Regions:
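Beta-strand/loop-alpha-helix module characteristic of Rossmann-like adenine-cofactor folds
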Residues: 77, 86-87, 93-132
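Class I S-adenosyl-L-methionine
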Residues: 2-92, 97
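Short intrinsically disordered, low-complexity coil segments enriched in acidic
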Residues: 1-7, 111, 127
Length: 132
């Protein structure tokens, strides 16, 4: 966070984490919750590009693993297409962290040899999967 000029952050970032941001940083809130997007994903991508083009060191702060239903792939694809370097420092997805925190194994050689993580949300304009 010390090296960032601007922090673009989501709704899932706790107040405790936000309190670690040093003074003098620009903050841009782009939080989304299911059914309520204060900023659409396409606009978030454009904000990332705008700040990078302005020569700023941008920190995109997301909860969990940005590549597990976090739209991280869309964001880095946008940056890569324009030739901007990026670094991913993933957190732990809640699909793994919550059961572990509760002492519930996700796999166990006597009971479960695999697990699946499936979103319950369809892309806008598409139907939810009936198989869920």
């Amino acid at each position: 966070m010390d090296e960032a000029d601007v922090i673009i952050y989501d709704a899932l970032i706790s107040a405790e984490i936000l309190s670690l941001i040093p003074d003098g940083k620009e903050w841009i809130y782009v939080g989304k919750r299911s059914g309520h997007h204060c900023v659409r994903q396409e606009e978030i991508n454009q904000i990332l590009l705008r700040e990078a083009k302005a020569g700023k060191n941008v920190l995109r702060l997301k909860g969990g693993d940005p590549f597990v239903f976090g739209r991280g792939a869309e964001e880095v694809e946008c940056l890569a297409a324009e030739g901007y370097p990026f670094e991913i420092i993933p957190g732990v997805t809640s699909a793994l962290a919550v059961p572990a925190y509760a002492g519930i194994p996700i796999t166990h050689r006597d009971f479960a040899s695999s697990f699946h993580v499936i979103t319950g949300h369809a892309k806008e304009g598409q139907k939810n999967r009936d198989s869920l």
